[in-house]
Amino acid sequence: MICFILFVFSFLVSVSATAPYKPDDVFLINCGETDVPFDNHGRTWTQEEKNILPKNSDNASFSSVVSYKEESGIPQVPYMTARIFRSDFTYSFPVSPGWKFLRLYFYPTSYKSGFDAVNSFVSVTVNDFTLLQNFSADLTVKASIPESKSLIKEFIVPVYLTLNLTFRPSNNSLAFVNGIEIVSMPDRFYSKGGFDDLITNVGSLIDFEIDNSTASETVHRLNVGGHMVDEVNDSGMFRRWLSDDYEFLIGGVSPYMPDVNISYTEKTPAYVAPAYVYSTCRMMGNAQDTYLNLNFNLTWLFTVDAGFSYLVRLHFFEKYLNKANQRVFSIFLGNQMAREEMDVIRLSGGPRIPIYLDFRIYVGSESGPRPDLRLDLHPLVKDNPEYYEAILNGVEILKLNNSGNLAIIQDNELKPNPPLSSNLTPNHVTQQIKGKSSHLLVKIFIAVGPGTGLATFVVVLMLWMRQMKRKNRKEERVVMFKKLLNMYTYAELKKITKSFSYIIGKGGFGTVYGGNLSNGRKVAVKVLKDLKGSAEDFINEVASMSQTSHVNIVSLLGFCFEGSKRAIVYEFLENGSLDQFMSRNKSLTQDVTTLYGIALGIARGLEYLHYGCKTRIVHFDIKPQNILLDGNLCPKVSDFGLAKLCEKRESVLSLMDTRGTIGYIAPEVFSRMYGRVSHKSDVYSFGMLVIDMIGARSKEIVETVDSAASSTYFPDWIYKDLEDGEQTWIFGDEITKEEKEIAKKMIVVGLWCIQPCPSDRPSMNRVVEMMEGSLDALEIPPKPSMHISTEVITESSSLSDGGEDV
């Protein structure tokens, strides 16, 4: 029976892996009037039907044909006719939910209507995404390498039900387009990761995630070592793979590999890349003495736009080698290590099995607006491979949207797209079965019967294998941490804490114990509970804390990762957490200068996390329990279990779950109606923390006098006190004028920080400036309210920095 199941399973995998992709949606629109339906490849193009045109199409546009055909190589379809726009013009395409290829065809020349594309500039949007801004097709083709007279711009956009494509001519200009192509793609084709379902985040220890609100632009797609692969020879998505013979390559040889037998798999189906791509490659050469290859790299240079993140997909295939450790090399992107050990045979499981890996890298503007993204392959010698060689078959590079904008970096925050589908995705299923034993596979098969049971068995088995792979990836990260930090055994922690006898704190995460190292230094040891998700929290905390070094950030001294035992060792802080301090020291909590010093230190710590680290760290759980105080009442931010790492230029984050603590969690984290989640979420939590520090004692008094106050939104009556100028009594009758101004300044800063719309909140840079500056320089903020309208989200007040750095 088991053999039969495995046979059928392998048959299903084989069929699905080798089957070509058939897109659900295909639109080929030849814009303007034409009687020629077929292009050079035999594909059928249609004219613009009324159902996709706007009602004002006659007034907003007109059609025209080229004055004369300048180049014999320019195809008749779709380049000889064009739709020319006088004003904003929106096509509406009914499509199924999911990501779509959008290809725009341009032939910048003169047209019989008198229109000359030389003077044409246009901005293009799809739903909430800006794809092009003040774009000139004429200037683009003149700067193209290799030289070309026509142009195709390819984008990948997520769409719910309707793809609204808008062309907006620039001032005193007309706009045009010759052809529009829309093609669907397999679910999460560019968002789930490579064959291993991972996107390696170059320069970070945390894998990158692409959510359903991310658009991209294809900037390079290469058939490495071979000729161009045109649309009809792709694997069903009509992609064009260019040769890498131009400025992309430095060094290497391109061997001829005839009659290649490619064994596609479920991990790398046939639609990932056509056989033409895996049939060609570039290698380093020097076959007689590969030791010479240690003197140089196999290198490509790709011109890209600065200020964006890029998804780099690399395709690999080994035909002639058949054992692991024959060819092992390292991959570098942007002069950073992307993968230390790349052994195609070891990863794929055998010869003639294609695989592909995904990497994400941010390209800054240090080298100008159009820098080169460098890709290097170099032999790895430490494992003593049989050949000192490297190989590459294909490259795809996608520019990822920056807060909804693929054209330029802008500050305004955009509304999120609706979800792609209400159906469960494989990720949802993984969450449901996480932590279950393998007996679940047998139970499901028996429960639903042999027919549907086999299909369910296959799906669950694949998901279980994916989960095991992610578990192995976490263990690989721990090995990396061992090189940077002290790693303690559980027995050593038991000795340090004297059998965990001294408890200094408890929480939902676990218990914190006091202890002493062998040199006498006091430490705190946080032992995590053995709960679902705690491994991910542990990885987050170690990864975040290992990158920090600041007086207002708790110092990580080491960790333990032993089976199910996980613990973090950090410096011991004598005064415990801020909430413990405030409950123990009522007299000190009335000292305005003490509270101000603590608040300013916390602000500086958050400023460092957002702007001082190489990789921005968003904490997501700022609250009194996570602020520790040393003997001098110097505050230190701690507990990074919910933290998220991202590049500093990324103003918008992707969250798969709600994270934070009620009372301090930013509204956009649990409801997208308030805006997009970003580092501004920490700003909100800081504001609530400051107001809590200033108003905690006042809140107790008010609730004693008026029980109805407990049901009032806390900042409401704080704001009323600020308006009435009666906040003195919070600290008693003996408060000085200077202390009164400090208290008022803290309240004003706190109220600015808790504005419901993230774009209205100051950055932590600005918060520190406000805290250190004078009260007179501060404006009174609008009254925060959780009941906001759409207009509030789209507007910004005088302290807004648009969701980005100031």
From Swiss-Prot:
Domain Protein kinase stretches: 498-775
InterPro entries named in the record: Kinase-like_dom_sf, LRK10/LRL21-25-like, Malectin-like_Carb-bd_dom, Prot_kinase_dom, Protein_kinase_ATP_BS, Ser-Thr/Tyr_kinase_cat_dom, Ser/Thr_kinase_AS
Example GO BP: response to metal ion
GO CC, one annotated term: membrane
Record: glycosylation sites: N59, N134, N164, N171, N212, N233, N261, N297, N401
Cytoplasmic side: 465-806
Gene Ontology MF terms: ATP binding; protein serine/threonine kinase activity
Extracellular side: 18-443
Residues bound to ATP: I504, G505, K506, G507, G508, F509, G510, T511, V512, K526
Signal peptide (from-to): 1-17
Matching SUPFAM superfamilies: Protein kinase-like (PK-like) (SSF56112)
Keyword annotations of the record: ATP-binding, Glycoprotein, Kinase, Membrane, Nucleotide-binding, Serine/threonine-protein kinase, Signal, Transferase, Transmembrane, Transmembrane helix
Subcellular location: Membrane
Residue intervals passing through the bilayer: 444-464
Pfam families referenced in this protein's UniProt entry, alphabetically: Malectin_like (PF12819), PK_Tyr_Ser-Thr (PF07714)
Bilayer disposition of the protein: Single-pass type I membrane protein
Similarity comment: Belongs to the protein kinase superfamily. Ser/Thr protein kinase family.
Identification of the protein by name: Probable receptor-like protein kinase At5g39030
Originating organism: Arabidopsis thaliana
Top-level taxonomy: Eukaryota, Viridiplantae, Streptophyta, Embryophyta, Tracheophyta
